[in-house]
């Protein structure tokens, strides 16, 4: 009986204890492999994310390492601005979505813009220096004439141009009723007023204004008869057309003379 119990006990112990060991081994191996699987999956996810941020399967720009901006954009060094803009827009559309390609294209385009700006600036400086040199080398009478000329602000030019253009239009509108004597008088008074503001001398302003009116009237009386008659309205008299030339002289004298 005891032997049977011993045998049964050994059987019981073997049936419960022996199988439990491999189960523990299997579980431990599974639990030990799980972190490595998670790490590998996360690594693949990060790798895919990085690839997608830098373009992934998007075509890449093949000239990213080309130093010359003209060669990088595929244009000639003598290309115009329109051609450079067209090349830049075409390349950005072709390689859109790839960050490094877009940065390379934009970098080359910005270099060309800066070089164009510097070249224009140098051209303007050289032009000013050449003009200044020519003025210094000009004869004395030309220097004295240039001393009487100045360049006012653009808003002043436009305001006075509008005033004398209005006087000319008013004279044309009233050409059927009478001559432009009143409009000419108003224009002369405005010219003298503007010159007096500038020179602070009423006598000098009157002298320049009357001289401009006489010069304009004289030039108009010489130029107008040379114009073919089919270009002139029948109601436009010689006096009216001469006054229009005089308005131009009055505008120039009160705007650019000092």
UniProtKB/Swiss-Prot annotation:
GO terms for biological process: cell death; chaperone-mediated protein folding; chloroplast organization; de-etiolation; embryo development ending in seed dormancy; positive regulation of protein import into chloroplast stroma. It is found in: Mitochondrion membrane; Plastid, Chloroplast envelope; Plastid, Chloroplast thylakoid membrane. Residues 1-48 form a transit peptide. Pfam families: CPP1-like. One of its GO terms (cellular component) is chloroplast envelope. Its main location: mitochondrion. The modification N-acetylthreonine is found at residue 49. Disruption phenotype: Reduced chloroplast biogenesis and chlorophyll synthesis associated with less POR protein accumulation. Photobleaching and growth inhibition of plants under light conditions. In dark-grown plants, reduced POR accumulation in etioplasts and impaired formation of prolamellar bodies, subsequently affecting chloroplast biogenesis upon illumination. Embryo lethal with arrested embryogenesis at the globular stage. InterPro entries: CPP1-like. Residues 67-122 are annotated as: J-like domain required for holdase chaperone activity. GO terms for molecular function: protein folding chaperone. Keywords: Acetylation, Chaperone, Chloroplast, Developmental protein, Membrane, Mitochondrion, Plastid, Thylakoid, Transit peptide, Transmembrane, Transmembrane helix. Expressed ubiquitously with higher levels in young leaves, flowers, and the root elongation zone. It is a multi-pass membrane protein. Coiled coil: none annotated. The chain crosses the membrane at residues 162-182, 207-227, 237-257. PANTHER family: PROTEIN CHAPERONE-LIKE PROTEIN OF POR1, CHLOROPLASTIC, PTHR33372. Essential protein required during embryogenesis. Exhibits holdase chaperone activity involved in the stabilization of NADPH:protochlorophyllide oxidoreductase (POR) proteins against photooxidative stress during POR proteins import into chloroplasts. Required for chloroplast biogenesis and development. When expressed in yeast, triggers mitochondria-mediated cell death associated with the loss of mitochondrial membrane potential. Belongs to the chaperone-like protein of POR1 protein family. This is Protein CHAPERONE-LIKE PROTEIN OF POR1, chloroplastic. The lineage of its organism: Eukaryota, Viridiplantae, Streptophyta, Embryophyta, Tracheophyta. The gene is CPP1.
């Amino acid at each position: 009986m005891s032997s049977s119990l011993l045998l049964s006990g050994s059987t019981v112990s073997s049936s419960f204890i022996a199988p439990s060991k491999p189960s523990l081994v299997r579980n431990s191996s599974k639990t030990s492999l799980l972190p490595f699987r998670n790490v590998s999956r996360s690594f693949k996810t990060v790798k895919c994310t990085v690839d997608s941020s830098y373009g992934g399967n998007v075509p890449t720009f093949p000239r990213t390492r080309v130093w010359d901006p003209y060669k990088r954009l595929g244009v000639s060094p003598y290309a115009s601005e329109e051609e450079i803009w067209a090349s830049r827009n075409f390349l950005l559309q072709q390689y859109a979505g790839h960050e490094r390609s877009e940065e390379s294209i934009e970098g080359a385009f910005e270099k060309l813009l800066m070089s164009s700006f510097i070249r224009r600036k140098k051209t303007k400086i050289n032009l000013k220096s050449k003009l200044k040199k020519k003025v210094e080398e000009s004869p004395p009478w030309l220097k004295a004439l240039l001393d009487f000329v100045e360049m006012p602000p653009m808003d002043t030019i436009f305001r006075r141009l509008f005033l004398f253009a209005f006087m000319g239009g008013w004279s044309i509108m009233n050409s059927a009723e009478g001559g432009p004597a009143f409009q000419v008088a108003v224009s002369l008074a405005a010219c003298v007023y503007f010159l007096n503001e500038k020179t602070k001398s009423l006598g000098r302003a009157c002298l320049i204004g009357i001289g401009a009116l006489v010069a304009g009237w004289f030039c108009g009386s010489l130029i107008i008869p040379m114009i073919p008659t089919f270009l002139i309205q029948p109601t436009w008299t010689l006096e009216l057309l001469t006054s229009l030339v005089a308005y131009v002289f009055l505008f120039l004298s009160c705007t650019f003379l000092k």
